[in-house]
Design a protein with these regions (language model features):
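Conserved alpha-helical positions within TPR/SEL1-like repeat arrays
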Residues: 10-18, 48-63, 89-104, 131-146, ...
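TPR/TPR-like (Sel1-like) alpha-helical repeat modules
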Residues: 235-246, 264-292
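Amphipathic alpha-helical segments of tetratricopeptide repeats
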Residues: 33-41, 78-83, 119-124, 161-166, ...
């Protein structure tokens, strides 16, 4: 199903936003909405133009952190779009914007059903926009994980993984990220063995496409180390932590917080294994490295 009708011009508004001229962008978007409401067209054509103008206004309000206004604009746009087949694409985009707005403002439970609807809309387009739907399902899975609904989270992660792997190929960062997310889900749910398998899959992909010394590789190694400790393979866990820390130390200017967090986990493991001298030695090293950033 394709969109129809002549759209409200959005490029001037987007250009103003890109230039940081937010007040002018808001004024232009508001004027476009007033024009759409007052024009002579009637029925579906008028509603289409108002819907598009509301979408643009909502985007501007969101950029300006006018959260209440943005939500109201998106919801009014969705109400006008209704269930019209010719506005399926517009409806999908409005729902996506509304879902992410709610999600990023700590209203995850409100965002979840909107994500569900948006993903279904993108999948129903002709041709389907499966990749966007998969990205939305990944976000939705993160919400369900946070809400403790692990089975639902797994369902959406696996659907996301299947689509992204099919459309983008196995050797892509997007696929590696979903494997990492699934591993995190399994770990949180208490399935460390399964988590370890997922983390390893993500590591294999990241090493191949990013190289062995990339900071995302360090993230995978840290996750693997944590899972190894949980299953009792502490010696391997130490080695993975140490490799991750070498990578992060080389990139400490950009990854100081990650270096400190992983270093703390490494120290905790050393202390749990009664290797206090090694723990103390690394603590001093980490403090010295971090002090160079002050």
């Amino acid at each position: 199903v394709s969109d129809t009708a002549n759209p409200i011009p959005t490029q001037p508004v987007l250009s103003l936003l890109a230039e940081g001229r937010h007040d002018e962008a808001l004024k232009a978007a508001t004027a476009a909405l007033v024009e759409a409401r007052n024009e002579g067209a009637e029925g579906d054509e008028r509603n289409t133009r108002i819907c598009q103008a509301l979408h643009t206004l909502g985007d501007v309000q969101r950029e300006m952190e006018q959260i209440v206004g943005a939500e109201a604009s998106y919801r009014e746009g969705l109400e006008l779009a209704g269930d019209r087949p010719d506005l399926l694409g517009e409806r999908a985009r409005l729902r996506m914007q509304l879902a992410t707005l709610l999600d990023f403002n700590q209203r995850e439970a409100d965002a979840a059903p909107v994500y569900e609807q948006a993903a279904a809309d993108f999948e129903a387009l002709t041709p389907p926009d499966d990749v966007t739907a998969a990205q939305l399902r990944n976000n939705l899975a993160m919400i369900y994980k946070g809400l403790g609904k692990f089975a639902l989270a797994e369902q959406h992660y696996l659907r996301s993984l299947e689509t992204i792997e099919l459309r983008m190929g196995r050797e892509s960062e997007a696929v590696a990220s979903v494997y990492n997310n699934i591993g995190s889900l399994y770990y949180t749910a208490g399935f460390a063995d399964e988590a370890l398998k997922m983390f390893k899959e993500g590591l294999i992909i990241r090493e191949k496409i990013l190289g062995p010394d990339h900071t995302d590789v360090a993230q995978s190694l840290s996750n693997i180390a944590t899972a190894r400790h949980e299953v009792g393979d502490n010696m391997s866990a130490l080695l993975d932590f140490e490799r991750a820390l070498r990578i992060l130390e080389e990139n400490v200017k950009e990854k100081a917080s990650s270096y400190e967090a992983v270093g703390g986990d490494y120290i905790s493991l050393l202390e749990a294994l009664h290797q206090e001298r090694r723990a103390e030695a690394f603590q001093k090293r980490m403090q010295k490295v971090l002090s160079t950033l002050a």
